[in-house]
Swiss-Prot record:
Region span, Disordered: 77-98
Designated name of the protein: tRNA methyltransferase 10 homolog B
Alphabetical list of InterPro entries matching this protein: MT_TRM10-typ, MT_TRM10-typ_sf, Trm10_B_MTase_dom, tRNA_m1G_MeTrfase_euk, tRNA_MeTrfase_TRMD/TRM10
Organism annotation: Homo sapiens (Human)
One term under GO cellular component: nucleus
Pfam families in alphabetical order: tRNA_m1G_MT
EC number: 2.1.1.221
Gene name as annotated: TRMT10B
């Protein structure tokens, strides 16, 4: 069968040209939209194909491409003009309001957060989350612990003076790790240490302080030379003194948050009072105290009203 080229070439239109309007926002290295770059490449291809066709068809091809190029050039010029006007507007606003801090880009803020966390790794306070007790927990409790780790890490990123976090007794093939990856977006990129070793073998025992509500000693200050340990344990059945007994096995110092010293029990209908906090709540208290050196303010940050405690000065 003989194929007729005459009269059919006008219907041939590059698929690249037909789909450009949806990708105007993507730009290449030269600042032009990728669609415009593809158009230029496609135009060369059309002209090469046009050399095989009749002279009249080739002339039509060139005019069609030129028309589309002019259309895209107008769009590109309009976008450049709009960006320039927006830049000049922001510059004028800064000149009129010199006291207002300029808004930083997300990339800049991420870099700033990364620098703060890496600085904490070398010179900041250290906090270990002891994850060696996951065998006590159900799948539901593991999911709750994974959520607490996410919130703790989020609070640490926002802190003016972050801790360096170390997840100890933590294996990548454990159910908890699977929950952390499933529930916490970007968990594998968290800026913290993950190790299978326990906290008692990583640091000198005399530098460790295990924070547990069962301790007899109230935490008076946050010592930058100490390594504080939080028990990664979500226990809905309340198995008492698990973390306290573990600290005693290694003759490690223990301390509790000074809730009894700065707070009192509040009367409530359920007569419920608890000093057991989630690890992210304990972290919020430590982080706030590190910045303010004010225990009432720090405890107010982490001890919710649902625990049945209020600050002493609230009663007075």
């Amino acid at each position: 069968m003989d194929w007729k080229l005459e009269g059919s070439t006008q219907k041939v239109e590059s698929p690249v040209l037909q789909g450009q309007e949806g990708i105007l926002e993507e730009t290449g290295e030269d600042g032009l939209p990728e669609g415009f770059q593809l158009l230029q490449i496609d135009a060369e291809g059309e002209c090469q194909e046009g050399e095989i066709l009749a002279t009249g068809s080739t002339a039509w091809c060139s005019k069609n491409v030129q028309r589309k190029q002019r259309h895209w050039e107008k769009i590109v010029a309009a976008k450049k003009s709009k960006r320039k006007q927006e830049k000049e507007r922001r510059k004028a606003n800064r000149a009129e309001n010199p006291g207002i801090c300029p808004q930083h880009s997300k990339r800049f803020l991420r870099a700033l957060t990364k620098d703060k966390l890496l600085e904490a790794k070398h010179s900041g306070p250290r906090l270990c989350i002891d994850l060696s007790m996951t065998h006590y927990m159900s799948k539901k409790e593991l999911s709750r612990l994974a959520g607490q780790i996410r919130r703790l890490y989020g609070s640490n990123k926002k802190a003016d003076r972050p801790f360096w976090i170390c997840l100890t007794g933590f294996t990548t093939d454990s159910p908890l790790y699977e929950e952390c990856v499933r529930m916490n977006d970007g968990f594998s990129s968290y800026l913290l240490d993950i190790t299978e070793e326990d906290c008692f073998s990583l640091f000198p025992l005399e530098t460790l302080v295990y924070l547990t509500p069962d301790s007899e000693h109230a935490l008076e200050d946050v010592d930058l030379n100490k390594v504080y340990i939080l028990g990664g344990l979500v226990d809905e059945s309340i198995q008492k003194k698990v973390t306290f007994q573990k600290a005693r096995e290694y003759s490690v110092k223990t301390a509790r948050l000074p809730i009894q010293e700065y707070m009192v029990r509040n009367q409530n209908g359920k007569n419920y009072h608890s000093e057991i906090l989630a690890i992210n709540q304990v972290f919020d208290i430590l982080s706030t105290y590190l910045e303010t050196h004010n225990w009432p303010e720090a405890l107010k940050k982490g001890v919710s009203s649902g625990k049945g405690y209020i600050l002493r000065n609230s009663v007075e």
